């Protein structure tokens, strides 16, 4: 149960951080 929760938490964090980094890189390239 704990491993499943941590796995979903990690997946959610990855889905949240990855687009943020992608947008950040795009903004840096635009500037």
Curated annotation (Swiss-Prot):
Where are the annotated coiled coils located?
A: none
Tell me the superkingdom of the source. Eukaryota
Q: Where in the cell is it found?
A: Plastid, Chloroplast thylakoid membrane
A single Gene Ontology biological process assigned to it is: photosynthesis
Assigned GO CC terms: chloroplast thylakoid membrane; cytochrome b6f complex
Which InterPro entries does the UniProt record give? Cyt_b6/f_cplx_su6
Q: What parts of the sequence cross the membrane? A: 4-24
Question: What keywords sit in the KW lines?
Answer: Chloroplast, Electron transport, Membrane, Photosynthesis, Plastid, Thylakoid, Transmembrane, Transmembrane helix, Transport
Cite the GO molecular-function annotations of the record: electron transporter, transferring electrons within cytochrome b6/f complex of photosystem II activity
Membrane topology, as annotated, equals: Single-pass membrane protein
What's the family? Answer: Belongs to the PetL family.
Tell me the function of this protein: Component of the cytochrome b6-f complex, which mediates electron transfer between photosystem II (PSII) and photosystem I (PSI), cyclic electron flow around PSI, and state transitions. PetL is important for photoautotrophic growth as well as for electron transfer efficiency and stability of the cytochrome b6-f complex.
HAMAP family hit by this protein: Cytb6_f_PetL (MF_00433)
The subunit structure is: The 4 large subunits of the cytochrome b6-f complex are cytochrome b6, subunit IV (17 kDa polypeptide, PetD), cytochrome f and the Rieske protein, while the 4 small subunits are PetG, PetL, PetM and PetN. The complex functions as a dimer.
The protein depicted here goes by the name Cytochrome b6-f complex subunit 6
